[in-house]
Amino acid sequence: MFAQPYDHSFNDLFNQYVNMETSAADGKDSTLSDFDQLFPLDSLSSDCGDLPPTVSTPNCHQSPQPWSNEWSLQNDGPAVDHFAFHDTVPLSAISDVNLNNFEVLSRPTATHALSTSPSTPPATPRRKPTQSALITPKSIRHRCPNERRSHLCKQSFSPSLMRSSNLSKARMAYPEAWAQQIQSFSLQSSEDRLPLSPPPSDVLIQHENRPAEQIMHQTRDSVEMPSQYDARLYHQPPSVSMPSPNIAMSARQPQHYIAHPSSSTLTNSSPSSADDMFSSSHSSDPHSLSSWQSDHLHPPSFSFTPDLQCQDSQWWSPMTSRVAQQQASYLTSPTPVRTMQSVGSQNDIMQGGLMIQFNPSYDMPADHSFSSNNMLPVAPQKFDTSFTTSQVHNVSRSPSLSPKAGTSPRDTHNGSISKPVHRRTHSRKLSGQSMNAPKPAKASGSSSRGSNKSVSVSFVNFTAHDSKKILTGVAPSGSSKTKARREQEARDRRRKLSEAALRAVRSAGGDVEALEAVLC
């Protein structure tokens, strides 16, 4: 009787349960087995006719609502009754056949059935307390003495179960749909917040002096996003926009100044490449001429020198881009350009908001954010900077910086390295000259004897007490064995030289004894 196919109404199930209680008085074990087969512990329903085992409602995925709002869904019709039945009946309550628990489960639908079908009784008859319950691990429900206490226990248990399941569902459901909704929302809010033209120089300086925490707080206040997506990917204040030209696209389109303007809506959703960040500040092309004034470019602010020959997009970490955002005020674009980007490329680049650092050889020729098909140039607008109309036209012809402004950081960088080296060598030479200043006098005194030895001692680091050792041909450094060997070689050399001199004097017919008396 109870195992007949499930009718699509919880009220019919309720009526069958009441009729079963009145008619079947001695079939308790079979009733329990049928009830267990109808509602297994693994899933809510697998044998319940045409009702699908898992029913997902759009109301459950929005946000976890209070327990009273879940009961208010009962007024929507019998279809909502199925959903409320599947969402609100916990497994532990179904596994136990205690009448008090099941009575609490059927109470909201019973009150609803009173308004729709008057034949439904308001409450189920009470079963004898001697009935044996189906005991399963972690699903034992104790009997409550009165009905009100059981109702309170049920209300304290079910909302936490529902909220935990709904939180897990809402957290894992449809990440691509989340990304599309966030992107469409960022389109609307960025149009309202970001200006079309770059802000004036005093505003840029004021924004630049602000700490990074205030910038991130302002970004977080502009759009509320889930925690797995970084807010800096979608919205950046005007002070941290990335307006810098691209080398590869400037060669294709010499008539437009290709940049990251402040009015771009989707460009900041992908991490900026290394060439897009630094190509304008380190462009070493001799043919590129521009009328940029070097007063707006402070050379100490540029500290990165990437590879200028690499034209494909290189991905940097967010910390490097944050360092590069400090120079964004000096790279303001005079001609703002709006760039559009497809949703698929954004999802591919973003990689779920994890900011995965790609390989430097990773390129996207089809969905590149600077492709010529997506460029929509906007007419140049006047703003309070030092640019005039003629300078704007000149800049649009040559998108890179002037060689003077571009090479000034390198000149200062090279000069800061070369000048200390020059000072070191000069001071070393001065110290060497001061130490070996008394050497030429002594060397000239003994030049007749060992003139060839004075040439071979130019590499030695001189000290105040090395003059005798150096003149004897022994270097002041080395181990004890090396010093002994060199001293022995010096003595042999002096002895040979003296013997050769004596032979020369004797062969010339001179007096050797008189010469030794004069020299010694």
Curated annotation (Swiss-Prot):
Composition bias type Basic residues, residue spans: 420-429
Gene disruption phenotype: Totally blocks pigmentation of conidia and leads to colonies with on a white tinge.
Biased amino acid composition, Low complexity: 261-294, 436-453
Keyword Transport: no
A single GO BP: sporulation resulting in formation of a cellular spore
UniProtKB keywords: Activator, Conidiation, Sporulation, Transcription, Transcription regulation
Biased composition (Polar residues): 388-401
UniProt superkingdom: Eukaryota
Residue segments, region Disordered: 110-149, 260-294, 388-453, 471-496
Keyword Plastid: no
Family listed: Belongs to the wetA family.
Function statement: BrlA, abaA and wetA are pivotal regulators of conidiophore development and conidium maturation. They act individually and together to regulate their own expression and that of numerous other sporulation-specific genes. Plays a crucial role in pigmentation and conidial cell wall integrity.
The protein's name: Developmental regulatory protein wetA
Gene that produces this protein: wetA
